[in-house]
UniProtKB/Swiss-Prot annotation:
Gene source species: Staphylococcus saprophyticus subsp. saprophyticus (strain ATCC 15305 / DSM 20229 / NCIMB 8711 / NCTC 7292 / S-41)
Gene for this chain: gpmI
Cofactor(s) annotated in UniProt: Mn(2+)
Family: Belongs to the BPG-independent phosphoglycerate mutase family.
Cofactor note text: Binds 2 manganese ions per subunit.
Protein name: 2,3-bisphosphoglycerate-independent phosphoglycerate mutase
Sequence positions that bind Mn(2+) 2: 12, 62, 438-439
UniProt cross-references to InterPro entries, sorted A to Z: Alkaline_phosphatase_core_sf, BPG-indep_PGM_N, Metalloenzyme, PGAM_B_sf, Pgm_bpd_ind
Pathway assignment: Carbohydrate degradation; glycolysis; pyruvate from D-glyceraldehyde 3-phosphate: step 3/5
Gene Ontology biological process terms, A to Z: glucose catabolic process; glycolytic process
Pfam families reported in the protein's UniProt record: iPGM_N, Metalloenzyme
Key word Metal-binding present: yes
PANTHER family reported in the protein's UniProt record: 2,3-BISPHOSPHOGLYCERATE-INDEPENDENT PHOSPHOGLYCERATE MUTASE
Catalysed transformations (reactions): (2R)-2-phosphoglycerate = (2R)-3-phosphoglycerate
SUPFAM superfamilies noted in UniProt: 2,3-Bisphosphoglycerate-independent phosphoglycerate mutase, substrate-binding domain, Alkaline phosphatase-like
Length: 505
């Protein structure tokens, strides 16, 4: 007899917001979501700031969200850990950072600093760059080159000049540091093996020829003149800088989120790299703020804190069969991040990865691969052996990042169609679903004055539990979702999971 599965369905980037203006969630025609919302118990939970282990007021993101969801507790994020280490001075005593600096001193070479130059707090924070500059100054370094990746996604689309000016003021204050190259994150921080993009950023960083400007500011302004926003600024070299990354140098990459920093780091450190032809660099000391992936051969500044008893491990320990399913853009989130930074499958776990469409930007294909994800899930459900399903629909977030309202509405409408088929199938099997999100985004695609808003929001996310006869607590946080799943599965919650089920007892 087929099992009665319990599913967690994450509508990525889908949050509650009262105002309809620029709110794709409110404006979309979503009969299935609305039907479940009126029929079943609902609540809303917090998905940002202190509730997910981030600094107060900091918007949540997919990595942080899935980690909190899977862990069933508040997980203190890299950003919070690094800020704390700077505040209490441990940062300046860090062995890996000091080893990088000593390597430069020994070789009379250059320290290169890579990273996303913004205060978005999703992948990086530029104040961490300032702390690195303080450390380099304290240690007497003279040559520090900054290779800046521009954001325009987790912050305003054209905000780079503000960060560039503040960084140049820091260079001036300390008497060290200069911009060496600048690339939009579209090039330097790809995660889908689009090596043609990464190669352009790599060539600028190595100073292998290409567009040159006399200053970072001039280069950004020239890109603005071509109607390019920060994310899409074409990699360029800053004139003063004429050395690039060379033998005997050191690199510190200060992004703390792994998924968009791994590919560039592989190019510099993986001797087996085959994406395009690279010139090996001898005696390069390469350090990354966190572990990016197994192909990156680097020293780690902040080692991972191990999370035990995540939802996947508890399911395994109780002999349950689980499925993780998403398209490429969110597959690491339902696997690696939801398992607390673990790549290996648990016993009884299987995975379905559906390729994301190969388009330049997802507003060109708002449905992305939602229908294929839905079809694959129905196929898996028909096997009748699943206890637990962890599913992510990427569209509201990925299309929401375009800052375009109509495509984002279409994205949500496509997901709603898929949601209906999936939830109805689970219900028909006698199972239950929790429909929720990991953070906001599509709830505010336009600002009040109709400018594109490409960032996440700090709004609470909805929760629907498709089970009759229960009521839900009035509030909670993402870390309460795993305990709620275990509650539906009639599985005891381990002590490590300090979240609380949203179901009233």
């Amino acid at each position: 007899m087929a099992k009665q599965p319990t599913a967690l369905i994450i509508l990525d980037g889908f949050a509650n917001r009262e105002s309809e203006h620029g709110n794709a969630v409110k404006l979309a025609n979503k009969p299935n979501f609305d039907r479940y919302y009126s029929k079943y118990p609902t609540t809303q939970i917090e998905a940002s700031g202190l509730d997910v282990g981030l600094p107060e007021g900091q918007m949540g993101n997919s990595e942080v969200g899935h980690m909190n969801i899977g862990a069933g507790r508040v997980v203190y994020q890299s950003l919070t850990r690094i800020n704390k280490s700077i505040e209490d001075g441990d940062f300046f005593e860090n062995d890996v950072l000091n080893n990088a600096i000593n390597h430069v001193k020994k070789n009379d070479s250059v320290l290169h600093v890579f990273g996303l130059l913004s205060d978005g707090g999703v992948h990086s924070h530029y104040k961490h760059l300032f702390a690195l500059l303080d450390l380099a100054k304290k240690q007497g370094l003279e040559k520090v080159y900054v290779h800046a990746f521009l954001d325009g996604r987790d912050v305003d689309q054209k905000s780079a000049l503000k960060y560039i000016e503040e960084t140049e003021a820091k260079f001036k204050e300390l008497g060290i540091g200069q911009f060496a190259s600048v690339s939009g994150r579209y090039y330097a921080m790809d995660r889908d093996k689009r090596w043609d993009r990464e190669e352009k950023a790599y060539n600028a960083i190595r100073n292998f020829g290409g567009t040159t400007f006399e200053s970072a500011k001039a280069g950004v302004e020239a890109n603005y003149d071509k109607d390019l926003t920060d994310e899409f600024v074409e990699p360029f070299i800053v004139q003063d800088q004429n050395e690039g990354v060379n033998d005997g140098d050191a690199v510190i990459f200060y992004n703390f989120r792994p998924d968009r920093a791994g590919q560039l780091s592989e190019i510099f450190t993986d001797k087996a790299f085959e994406g395009f032809k690279v010139e090996q660099i001898n005696d390069l000391f390469y350090a990354t703020f966190t572990k990016y992936n197994d192909n990156v051969n680097a020293e780690i500044v902040f080692e991972k804190v191990d999370l035990t008893n995540t939802i996947g491990e508890v399911a395994q320990d109780n002999g349950l069969k689980q499925l993780r399913i998403a398209e490429t853009e969110k597959f690491p989130h339902v696997t690696y991040f939801m398992s607390g930074g673990r790549n290996e499958e648990f016993e009884g776990e299987r995975r379905r990865l559906i390729d994301s469409p190969k388009v330049a930007t997802y507003d060109l294909k708002p449905e992305m691969s939602a229908y294929e994800v839905k079809d694959a899930l129905i196929e898996e459900l028909n096997k009748g052996d699943l206890d637990l399903i962890l599913l992510n629909f990427a569209n509201p977030d990925m299309v929401g990042h375009s800052g375009m309202l109509e495509p984002t509405i279409k994205a949500i409408e496509a997901v709603d169609e898929c949601l209906g088929e999936v939830v109805d199938k689970i219900t028909e099997m006698g199972g239950h679903a929790i429909i929720t999100a990991d953070h906001g985004n599509s709830d505010m695609v336009l600002t009040d004055d109709d400018q594109p808003m490409t960032t996440h929001t700090t709004n609470p996310v909805p929760v629907i539990v498709t089970k009759d006869g229960v009521t839900l607590r009035e509030t909670g946080r993402l870390g309460d979702l795993a305990p709620t799943l275990l509650d539906l599965l009639n599985v005891d919650q381990p002590e490590d999971m300090t979240g609380e089920s949203l179901i009233n007892h």
